[in-house]
Amino acid sequence: MSSNSFAYNEQSGGGEATELGQEATSTISPSGAFGLFSSDMKKNEDLKQMLESNKDSAKLDAMKRIVGMIAKGKNASELFPAVVKNVASKNIEIKKLVYVYLVRYAEEQQDLALLSISTFQRALKDPNQLIRASALRVLSSIRVPIIVPIMMLAIKEASADLSPYVRKNAAHAIQKLYSLDPEQKEMLIEIIEKLLKDKSTLVAGSVVMAFEEVCPDRIDLIHKNYRKLCNLLVDVEEWGQVVIIHMLTRYARTQFVSPWRQGDVLEDNEKDFYDSDEEQKEKADKRKRPYAMDPDHRLLIRNTKPLLQSRNAAVVMAVAQLYWHIAPKSEAGIISKSLVRLLRSSREVQYIVLQNIATMSIQRKGMFEPYLKSFYVRSTDATMIKILKLEILTNLANEANISTLLREFQTYVKSQDKQFAAATIQTIGRCATSITEVSDTCLNGLVCLLSNRDEIVVAESVVVIKKLLQMQPMQHGEIIKHMAKLLDSITVPVARASILWLIGENCERVPKIAPDVLRKTAKSFTSEDDLVKLQILNLGAKLYLTNSKQTKLLTQYILNLGKYDQNYDIRDRTRFIRQLIVPNEKSGALSKYAKKIFLAQKPAPLLESPFKDRDHFQLGTLSHTLNTKATGYLELSNWPEVAPDPSVRNVEVIELAKEWTPAGKAKKENPDKKFYSESEEEEDSSESSSDSESESGSESGEDEEDDRSGDSAEDSGESGSEPEAGKGRAATRSRARGRGDSKDVDKEKENSKTSESSSGESSSIEESSSDSESESESESESESRKVTKEKEKKTKQERNPLTKDVSLLDLDDFNLVSTPVALPTPALSPSLIADLEGLNLSATSSVISVSTPVFVPGKTHVLLHRMSGKGLAAHYFFPRQPCIFGDKMVSVQITLNNTTDQKIENIHVGGKKLPMGMQMHVFNPIESLEPAGSITVSMGIDFCDSTQTASFQLCTKDDCFSVNIQPPVGELLLPVAMSEKDFKKEQGMLSGMNETSTTIIAAPQNFASSVILQKIVNVANVGVVPSGQDNIHRFAAKTVHSGSLMLVTVELKEGSTAQLIINTEKTVIGSVLLRELKPVLSQG
């Protein structure tokens, strides 16, 4: 029978028959199990044969069936070898489906996927955008560290692709590469910065998601793209909108002042009885001055408002949380209607939305009161939905609607869902505590529930009544008597314990009932729950103190039972009570106060909403749902007291247009800008902005814009006129920007203050934009801001020629050192210009120069052991000398030894495996090395200011050996000579985020000046800075690659402690150096 089925399946159309056969087999008796397995196996064999067929139609049919299997959740991983063979198919449809399959299984079958990696690389150049994007997706799905450089190169190329779909996939690949190798963060940030400038709505959401994953703290990357993201938001795909809105919410909380400020308008009742005319005038001015919202803040709120109508619940929830966290309270009410609309969705969506509404309704009841009936419970609701609706109804309850809600709650108590009924009773108790007018009504209703047939309802009622009676201890003695009668019929431990606690607390008010209750419970003590036993012991102790004649023997009997109980908590409580209430020779002073201890007035319980403390989590996040901080959660920062400079969000439109001017003319145009009229500038800016909306415009200007990022506020003609010289001064520019950021901002503020018309215009823009809602006014506002920015730039550029001459004179007069550190070029940094304007030619100039090493350690490192190198041994050390092969390279000396009795020929460096950006200058090949001979050669390696390993092959005539050189962080520095004054000045500029410090504890003899000097220079190649204080030692250096200053301070404290402080722009290197210096200084 089985042979017939095999033969039948081999015929054409056997695939469909097999699928039908499978479905039929599943309904047959277990005896047909073999048929099921054989048909499964045969079906896969059939698919493999179709994939190996010469006909494209068969392959296409097989791939469609395989993708269909994946879509149904079936495992198709065993077909990977057969599928991957078709990755180079010329049929575009087959290739698409193959890539869909590979994206799913490449991570599981990494070894097989690596065999086709060359095909994927070729596919990255395919004319079809879908193939290019799919190849990138497959490549990024192969999670093997060895292909990280290939992935990085592919992402770089794809980020500049003409197709926005490919660029979108490049943004997705960034996240995968970062999770595979976090050390690539800096290079990935550069790509993210480039993609953030992309004007395609297809790319925006994906690149913001990559930004959130890789560098969410780099808010500076968002400044220039903020307005573009706000304007593109409506057209971005739905899930991209969610990510962008959440990111912009965090951004707004750091860049704008709070719109919730109280006291901006004076109240009438604050006015004094007698006021002078001036005081009345001042108060009237304050009363007229409302909160002026930043135009960019208003832009975000206005552009997200239409998204409240989105069909996607996640988008609506994202906009709702944005309004809740950053919009004025008077405007946040519009989100309530949209959130109520979402309650018609699935129960999962309802659950999340109701949780967020529950949090909102605690603080702002008025938002959801008009929609009270929307939160009434339906019989079809799930239990979790019912309980959340109860929570919201409780939050919205007030004197006006409580009567309606109580009638609703009476119906809920009768529900067959016992968990929901118990929650309703808890709700009634909360309403009774929050609204005193109905507390008696609620209490009477709960007492009526004590006669309910359902034991769970009675038990929950007892617990709630106990809490309510605790708030009014002097009343309701009859209720306590009634509850004592119910003790025989109630079996729920929590309810029995509550009744016993109530009787114990009020034992003096019910002197006849309490001893009888103790007698009954003493009989059943051994069979009671542990919670009830504890309350029986407490009741016995209280009665022993208040009515010992009647209850003394009974209490001793209960204490003896508790002494031998199985639960150690009961035994422990018994010993505690016996020592406290039964005085004996060993009793301490506490026994005198036993009555005060047991019968003290207990504070009333506080019935609060479980959502009260959730508002510190951002709404709509997983952390808010779980009420605990989830992995990857980004906290919302507090509003700043003073808004940061809004000019950082201004886009330099004129600068973008100038990139297309010839290189030789760019320098001449800069001083002539003052001859252009304002109207012409305004026209130019509007034209260039409209041109930049096209797709080609966004692509063509990106590379140049990246090279010049950060230079737009400086001399714009520098990079255009001297491209070659600009490359040579790259380190100088980055150094100037790093140290002058804060001064640049201050300088821009001063320039804006010098022009009254400019400041007046910007203030009028703020007022009009905060009052206006129309799109046309927002456009004119943005143009006005651009014009204002251009006026500020003109003011600076008019001053540039004079300052340039002065600074050139100064530098010519004082350029006395042959090897200066890369200092900021005068024409680039406004902060340096401001410093040089008041400089006197007779003043002493501060010059920071590279000095000779203070100490060169003789420590060598093994490069190649003689056993591994077949007799060839190699050691390397760092001579701390300037490298002759390049200014950015670290000099490395390698000593080669021949430990064999034969000559070793043709020693050279073979293949190199260097991280991205790293460069190596190898030594010349050595023709031969005699037996027992030794030779020392020099190499230069540019480590790019990192401690990454430089891997290469050391080869001889017959063999190649893989070797590694990993530099200590102290060898990536060059010593610097500078004065104490210059040191303090540079240290002041490198404070805050650029400063790391730690405390060192060591013996006093280890803090001698000579010891500290020897330990520091042994670890790091730094120069000694003269210090006028005996307890402070200063050292200075610069990084070899970028020339960034590294300032080290050791400040001795009282006792045997000291503080180690490192200031540098290179915070990673600074923290590594700190970790290496700390143990060295601590040890004896």
Swiss-Prot record:
The record's listing under PANTHER family reads: ADAPTOR COMPLEX SUBUNIT BETA FAMILY MEMBER (PTHR11134)
What ranges does the record list as Low complexity composition bias?
A: 718-729, 754-767
Its recorded name reads AP-3 complex subunit beta-1
Topology within the bilayer:
Peripheral membrane protein
Name of the coding gene: AP3B1
Subunit and interaction comment? Adaptor protein complex 3 (AP-3) is a heterotetramer composed of two large adaptins (delta-type subunit AP3D1 and beta-type subunit AP3B1 or AP3B2), a medium adaptin (mu-type subunit AP3M1 or AP3M2) and a small adaptin (sigma-type subunit APS1 or AP3S2). AP-3 associates with the BLOC-1 complex. Interacts with KIF3A; interaction is direct; interaction is impaired by pyrophosphorylation of AP3B1.
Compositionally skewed regions (Acidic residues) per UniProt: 678-717, 768-781
Coiled coil segments of this chain: none
Gene Ontology CC terms, in alphabetical order = AP-3 adaptor complex; axon cytoplasm; clathrin adaptor complex; clathrin-coated vesicle membrane; Golgi apparatus
**Function description:** Subunit of non-clathrin- and clathrin-associated adaptor protein complex 3 (AP-3) that plays a role in protein sorting in the late-Golgi/trans-Golgi network (TGN) and/or endosomes. The AP complexes mediate both the recruitment of clathrin to membranes and the recognition of sorting signals within the cytosolic tails of transmembrane cargo molecules. AP-3 appears to be involved in the sorting of a subset of transmembrane proteins targeted to lysosomes and lysosome-related organelles.
Name its GO BP terms in alphabetical order: anterograde axonal transport; anterograde synaptic vesicle transport; intracellular protein transport; vesicle-mediated transport
Similarity comment text for this entry:
Belongs to the adaptor complexes large subunit family.
Q: Which InterPro entries match?
A: AP3_beta, AP3B1/2_C, AP3B1_Ser, AP3B_C, AP_beta, ARM-like, ARM-type_fold, B-adaptin_app_sub_C
Region of interest (Disordered), residue spans = 1-26, 663-800
* UniProt xrefs under SUPFAM superfamilies: ARM repeat (SSF48371)
- In the record, Phosphoserine modifications are located at 276, 609, 742
The annotated regions of Basic and acidic residues compositional bias extend over 666-677, 738-753, 782-800
Upper taxonomic lineage: Eukaryota, Metazoa, Chordata, Craniata, Vertebrata
- Write out the entry's keywords from A to Z: Cytoplasmic vesicle, Golgi apparatus, Membrane, Phosphoprotein, Protein transport, Transport
Modification comment: Phosphorylated on serine residues. Pyrophosphorylation by 5-diphosphoinositol pentakisphosphate (5-IP7) impairs interaction with KIF3A. Serine pyrophosphorylation is achieved by Mg(2+)-dependent, but enzyme independent transfer of a beta-phosphate from a inositol pyrophosphate to a pre-phosphorylated serine residue.
Q: Where in the sequence does UniProt note compositional bias of the Polar residues kind?
A: 1-11
User: Where does this protein reside within or beyond the cell?
Assistant: Cytoplasmic vesicle, Clathrin-coated vesicle membrane; Golgi apparatus
Q: Which domain of life does this protein belong to?
A: Eukaryota
